[in-house]
């Protein structure tokens, strides 16, 4: 293999690199898994375990997507979204949930204009 070939990015990775994704989950393992997957796919990824830090990051930096856990401390995902929607109505949000009863997350999705959800298993 020629030198430098391993450094070539696919067209998809180049396209993905322009997207900034922020994830917040109080489980470090989830952040680590998302980091590995999204960075390998070429995305510009930032992960945090503190919901308050996530709110501050969205205030001070541009992100194209927020992936967040539904149940966290000190704030639940719905509280994080309520705060973010006060100053950023355009951010695409994906809610992660390990909730067995999907009624609370689905009600939150409708109420807070969250674009999607994904179940943790």
Q: Which residues does each PLM region occupy?
A:
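Two-component/phosphorelay signaling modules centered on CheY-like receiver
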Residues: 28-46
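Acidic catalytic/metal-coordinating carboxylates
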Residues: 19, 49-53, 75-80
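Acidic, metal-coordinating helix/loop segments flanking the phosphotransfer/catalytic sites
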Residues: 47-65
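Alpha4 helix (beta4-alpha4-beta5 surface) of REC/receiver domains from two-component response regulators
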Residues: 79, 86, 100-118
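Non-catalytic signal-transmission and effector/linker regions of two-component phosphorelay proteins
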Residues: 1-20
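Conserved phosphotransfer cores of two-component systems
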Residues: 59-61, 84-90, 111-112
């Amino acid at each position: 293999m020629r030198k430098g070939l391993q450094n070539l990015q696919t067209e998809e990775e180049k396209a993905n690199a322009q997207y900034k994704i922020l994830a917040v989950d109080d489980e470090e393992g989830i952040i680590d898994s998302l980091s590995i997957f999204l960075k390998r796919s070429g995305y510009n990824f930032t992960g945090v375990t503190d919901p308050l830090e996530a709110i501050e990051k969205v205030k001070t930096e541009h992100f194209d997507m927020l992936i967040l856990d539904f149940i966290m401390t000190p704030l639940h995902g719905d509280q994080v979204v309520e705060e973010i929607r006060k100053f950023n109505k355009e951010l695409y949000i994906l809610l992660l949930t390990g909730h067995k009863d999907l009624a609370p997350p689905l009600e939150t999705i409708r109420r807070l204009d969250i674009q999607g959800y994904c179940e943790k298993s």
